[in-house]
């Protein structure tokens, strides 16, 4: 088992072995995010699902109300005059067969790939390149669409695609350590509601098993997910 660095061990010693209320957990992680850069805040949710079964898979999007604090580089595979329209809407890269060819050769200078339905037969051939990176466009994720301008705007504003990994854990960045605790809580609450709203039909037993929040270089803190779910339900 790898040893914790002295710095991380020192930070972890400030955290008690218990679950924390959502706002308290966020404040604690923020307090420990003291690297020389603006650390990314991450949520790690263990769900009671087995994604090897199709009715227990989770893949969707969340529109974080306060954004992620990160610049998203978007590439669009489309055709005709829509190529210029995609660039005008804010896409860093846009093209048709030429972009498909570039991607097939390993040119991946983007964080998100959007495609129009007419180009999906060509994009589908890139599965070996895009699949392992989680970049294959998908209608459920809003990355296969005819409304390119709206999709580009939404993803630039903080819309995120996420999925449960093969062990049933969801990993999502939900802001920066420089955000206020209230802004981060609002983002985390939106994520929780999205996960609950998209509960797979085949999920059995307890859906939420654990929730941890952490920063890029900091220790993780366990959050009382029931308290998070109860926010806004008072009265």
From Swiss-Prot:
* Name this polypeptide is given: Large ribosomal subunit protein uL1
The job of this chain, per UniProt, is described as:
Binds directly to 23S rRNA. The L1 stalk is quite mobile in the ribosome, and is involved in E site tRNA release.
NCBIfam families of this UniProt entry?
Answer: rplA_bact
What is known about its subunit structure?
Part of the 50S ribosomal subunit.
List the signal peptide residues: none
Q: Which organism is it from?
A: Synechococcus sp. (strain CC9902)
* Residue intervals passing through the bilayer: none
A molecular-function term among this protein's GO annotations: tRNA binding
Q: Which Pfam families match?
A: Ribosomal_L1
List UniProt keywords, sorted A-Z: Repressor, Ribonucleoprotein, Ribosomal protein, RNA-binding, rRNA-binding, Translation regulation, tRNA-binding
Known InterPro entries for this protein?
Ribosom_uL1_bac-type (IPR005878), Ribosomal_uL1 (IPR002143), Ribosomal_uL1-like (IPR023674), Ribosomal_uL1/biogenesis (IPR028364), Ribosomal_uL1_3-a/b-sand (IPR016095), Ribosomal_uL1_CS (IPR023673)
Task: Please state which protein family the record places this protein in.
Answer: Belongs to the universal ribosomal protein uL1 family.
Establish whether keyword DNA damage is in the entry.
Answer: no
Record-linked CDD domains: Ribosomal_L1
The protein's superkingdom reads Bacteria
GO annotation, biological process: regulation of translation; translation
Q: Which HAMAP family match?
A: Ribosomal_uL1_B
Report the GO terms under cellular component.
large ribosomal subunit
């Amino acid at each position: 088992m790898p040893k914790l660095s002295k710095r991380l061990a020192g930070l972890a010693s400030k955290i008690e072995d218990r679950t924390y209320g959502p706002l308290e957990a966020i404040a604690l992680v923020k307090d420990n995010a003291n690297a020389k850069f603006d650390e990314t805040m991450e949520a790690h949710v263990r769900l009671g699902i087995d994604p090897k079964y199709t009715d227990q898979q989770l893949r969707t999007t969340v529109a974080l109300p306060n954004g992620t604090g990160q610049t998203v580089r978007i590439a669009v595979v489309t055709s005709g005059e829509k190529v210029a329209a995609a660039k005008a809407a804010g896409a860093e890269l846009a093209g048709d067969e030429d972009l498909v060819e570039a991607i097939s050769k390993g040119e991946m200078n983007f964080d998100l790939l959007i495609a129009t339905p007419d180009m999906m037969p060509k994009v589908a051939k890139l599965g070996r390149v895009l699949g392992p990176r989680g970049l294959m466009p998908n209608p459920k994720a809003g990355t296969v669409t005819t409304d390119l301008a709206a999709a580009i705007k939404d993803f630039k504003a903080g819309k995120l695609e996420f999925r449960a990994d093969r062990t049933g854990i969801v990993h999502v960045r939900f802001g920066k350590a420089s955000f206020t605790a209230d802004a981060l809580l609002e983002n985390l609450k939106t994520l929780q509601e999205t996960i609950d709203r998209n509960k797979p039909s085949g999920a059995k037993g307890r859906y939420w098993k654990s929730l941890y929040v952490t920063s890029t270089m900091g220790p993780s803190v366990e959050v009382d997910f029931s308290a998070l779910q109860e926010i806004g339900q008072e009265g």
